[in-house]
């Protein structure tokens, strides 16, 4: 408790923590050694000043050290968003993940229940019949047999129980909104990572660069979505071969029509699950288009497609052939066959 006070004192002066200081501070937080008052003061001091790249690297390092790991193929990918964009859209990354798995790229999907929308990845998967909350062996069996496994944040980041009530009571974004997508329990080095603000594109790419990321796109839609959007341009900061570059993409570059935000709105988990099943069944819609765009980006990241146009064609074939629907059926069967849910 007393060991934590110097970190608060430093932040109170407007100074930032070094990488080592941030790691030490978050190690104490994840060990449950910090009082609620200390935690609240610490998080808000950091938020008001603005979290630095070194502070995030230190926090991620501490969080990764305590996570319950999953063994996945080295070429596995995660399609994930920070959430918190406030738009309540359809579960784009979940549908995109199923499409990518059907294209032969292993997917180690990390997610949670809804934060700002009515239906998070875990919510819609449960509505589809997938058993979430599996332990590492259960997730590994799903990845082996279905090409995709879902890792529930609470199951694999048990240390987060020490911050759960403070996050709810603060009721505003903190550094923890950024940490989850940066701490995939399967240790993926390939990611399509959507963020709630364009300001975080470069910083998060720098964090992943420092922590061994190989090929990552950090993305934000011009409409505010934490995904590649089909309503207009999307901003991308890519990490590849150790180098970072930024560019803009449009749905037209992928051969897709433009949509409106209203077209992309989601509902409750059951509504979104029904729409997802329809999309997997080949129904043409704005949901299908935005999922194909994000799947195409993941296929480019995974070196399965040379560009977005080719990625969309490969993804559409996986949907229209029934392969993506078959992936979901396998995931449902394997997740329920395993009795190791936490």
From Swiss-Prot:
Cofactor: Mg(2+)
Pfam families on file: Glycos_trans_3N (PF02885), Glycos_transf_3 (PF00591)
Binding site for anthranilate 1: 81, 112
EC number(s) given by UniProt: 2.4.2.18
Binding site for Mg(2+) 1: 93, 227
GO cellular component terms, A-Z: cytosol
Catalytic function, reaction form: N-(5-phospho-beta-D-ribosyl)anthranilate + diphosphate = 5-phospho-alpha-D-ribose 1-diphosphate + anthranilate
Matching HAMAP family: TrpD
Subunit annotation: Homodimer.
PANTHER family assigned: ANTHRANILATE PHOSPHORIBOSYLTRANSFERASE (PTHR43285:SF2)
Protein name, as recorded: Anthranilate phosphoribosyltransferase
Native organism: Beijerinckia indica subsp. indica (strain ATCC 9039 / DSM 1715 / NCIMB 8712)
Gene giving rise to this polypeptide: trpD
